[in-house]
Amino acid sequence: MSDVLRLDREMMALALQQARASLDAGGVPVGAVLASGDEVIAAGHNERVQHGDPVAHGEISALRNAGRRASYGDTTMYTTLSPCQMCTGAILLFQIPRVVVGEARTFAGDLDFLRSKGVEIVLLDDLGCVAAMEEFQARYPQVWSEDIGGR
């Protein structure tokens, strides 16, 4: 296993911990980590249910927790689920050059769109990420349908 893939898997494990924290609180299990190399800048998870905030997706929470930055040009966004249109927009707005996705089985997002804008996409197809979303979708189908799952 290459050093890059090893780091990607380590960071995804941190993002999955965030997703599990959201699931344990009755929320949507999407976790995210914003990193520069092996340095974690910030982490977050979906808090839409917990805070009644429709834009508190995992990637957005990680960006909020990162605070202001002059540039995101050296960062990677690790997210347990393929980004929705809103989170895709944030990735493009802040010019995050690399996104590592835990899984795109339970929600495909539009990874080709990100690629077409020059974003490097790595899809890990992590079974832990898949299991967390499948558990959530089975336990809370109505909550999922209120969010991106309703499409």
Question: What are the roles of these predicted feature ranges?
Answer:
Residues 30-38:
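Short beta-strand scaffold segments in enzyme catalytic cores
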Residues 28, 71-73, 95:
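Short loop/turn motifs at secondary-structure junctions
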Residues 79-97:
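Local cysteine-cluster metal-coordination motifs and their immediate loop/turn environment
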Residues 1-22, 92-151:
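Zinc-dependent deaminase
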Residues 70-82:
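Immediate flanking context of iron-sulfur cluster ligation sites
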Residues 47-61:
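A short, polar/charged loop-to-alpha-helix boundary motif
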Residues 15, 19-22, 32, 58, ...:
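Small-residue (primarily alanine) positions within well-ordered alpha-helices
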